[in-house]
Amino acid sequence: MPVAKDLFPEYGTLATGENEPSRNIRRAQKLREFQNLELPPYLAKQVAAKMAEKGLAVEATGGVAVQRIAGGSQSGQKALMGASSSALTKHTPSASQPTTHDSLTNLGANLTQSKPAWHAPWEIYRVITGHQGWVRSVCVEPENQWFATGSADKTIKIWDLATGKLRLTLTGHIMGVRALGVSPRHPYMFSGGEDKMVKCWDLETNKVVRHYHGHLSAVYSLDIHPTLDVLVSAGRDAVARVWDIRTRDPVVVLSGHKSTINRVKFQASEPQVITASADETVRLWNLQAGKTMTTLTHHKKSVRGLTLHPEEFTFSTASANSSKQWKCPEGDLVLNYDDQNAIINTLSVNQDNVMFSGGDNGSIGFYDWKTGHMFQSTQSIPIPGSIESENGIFDSSFDKTGLRLITCEADKSIKMWREKPNATAESDPGLEWKPKIYQTY
């Protein structure tokens, strides 16, 4: 009489029972399914200890633990369980190692991990003051000569990147300035503010030459396409608007979010628009069709941080205590970053795969982009004369070389960071890395 196969053995056995051949078949199926996964050394020791408690033989062969399972052949039941510095790294199957231990059945959805590269720690080398309100936005011009900051004091200030000295103050907004961007193709700078306005500044005359009307509430973010003459802006009205820079006409209106859009970016190669919203979602939009391609619902709180890698087709998003990396253009989840105990307001990444994360409580994290490991954690310190609560970080940007970082903060200051000179892996090893099992959820 045939015996039904138990599809959920972890929840109990079928009442009809199961004979020994059926159990061996099911075990062999699991072994084949996970034959190319390898355990990190510390997990291999734990598994070996558990198997010893169950009375199953575990022997060491050339530094690799091999388990013999009763009821099956030795060649079909050897399991690689150690001898690797990376966690769950995939390797090419061979006849000598066709299968792994069936304790790996719970690890099927885990991501490949590798040891992170060493990065030098970062330190503050300059503090700039001059704004009379919270500094809410920053952008670096394409030639890497100066950068601009926008503030709640309604002004835009332009600073020399090398010396940190004030070059110019621009006035024109009647409320706080929340977004800035400099065109890589034209001598224009764009600004968005709480006055619902998007302004185009001629950098040769330092005057406003265009206004873009349409937003029904404050503009929180904007971005300029690197190759097309279009601009995207978004904000509290939950809509992203794409504009023709020259004619000021709206090209397309991207609607679908249910709450404030905190960040918006162009992904030039598709072309795509990526938006991060307070409705806890991230949307990827087809720019030509003006429709949503993908909605990412993995975050459980308002998504405030968004950054694109300058050399890869990947991007990262952040909300309270959660940062995630995604792949363009589909929006596939790549990895979860180490936790940061803060509501994260801003993310930035440079060419050297260093990602900066700044929180509303002054929490700062530096991450390895490839692995999600936080190699440095520190805290912003308010400048003298500020109250303790004024240590939030609102915006950040690396310069074009990736060697300097600029942060905008609630203490009305601008802080500039660089890698610690003469740092080595021996003198500054950073936070300890341990392999973890990240779930794709």
From Swiss-Prot:
Superkingdom, natural source: Eukaryota
Polar residues bias (residue ranges): 83-107
Positions of region (Disordered): 1-22, 81-107
GO CC field: catalytic step 2 spliceosome; cytoplasm; post-mRNA release spliceosomal complex; Prp19 complex
Start and stop residues of the WD repeats: 130-169, 172-211, 214-253, 256-295, 298-336, 339-379, 388-427
Major localisation: cytoplasm
Keywords (A to Z) from UniProt: Cytoplasm, mRNA processing, mRNA splicing, Nucleus, Repeat, Spliceosome, WD repeat
Compartment(s) where it occurs, according to its Swiss-Prot or TrEMBL record: Cytoplasm; Nucleus
Record flagged with keyword Transmembrane: no
InterPro entries: G-protein_beta_WD-40_rep, Prp46/PLRG1-like, WD40/YVTN_repeat-like_dom_sf, WD40_repeat_CS, WD40_repeat_dom_sf, WD40_rpt
CDD domains linked: WD40
Coiled-coil segments on the chain, per record: none
GO biological process: mRNA cis splicing, via spliceosome; mRNA splicing, via spliceosome
Quaternary structure, from the entry: Associated with the spliceosome.
Alphabetical list of PANTHER family matching this protein: PLEIOTROPIC REGULATOR 1, WD40 REPEAT PROTEINPRL1/PRL2-RELATED
Function: Involved in pre-mRNA splicing and required for cell cycle progression at G2/M.
Family per record: Belongs to the WD repeat PRL1/PRL2 family.
Name of the protein described by the UniProt record: Pre-mRNA-splicing factor PRP46
Gene (name only): PRP46
